[in-house]
Amino acid sequence: SADWENEDPTCAAKYTIAVPSEVDVETAKFAASYAYTANIIFMASGNKLYRINLDRGQVTELYAYEVDSSAQIASLKFKDPESVREENDGEAEGEYKEKLGMCLGLGINTGEKGVVVEIQLTMAGDISREERSICVYEDPNQPIGKIVDITYNYE
């Protein structure tokens, strides 16, 4: 058997963070990516996305789905949270891998339909200022039903 199978789980650190009053900690969703090694995680609650800097104890609102303030973010996932630049990667491949780990998808339920929003983040965890850094996927002719979870397919 592998060594890791016999190890008890360990906790590397414990943080206490004050979250905004509108955040429901019982239903909040969290995501982390290898691209953010500086103790940054992301949280969604209601229609808002937040960046949490664990080292500084800061919670920053990054995005709100303003079309419907009662919308609920049901899922948030990075395109590839395990994507890491390898030493032998060429420059283009390395940059591509880094961007995958900084692209966050949100599955949002609003009324009777679902909306998928994809956000390109920077190395600091801010929303990129590049054109099309926030893409909203919805088609009134082919509405998405209620979203439970989202995933990425690379085929």
Describe these PLM feature segments.
Residues 1-23, 30:
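Intrinsically disordered, low-complexity acidic/Ser/Thr/Pro-rich linker and tail segments
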Residues 41-44, 102-109:
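Conserved beta-strand element within WD40/beta-propeller blades
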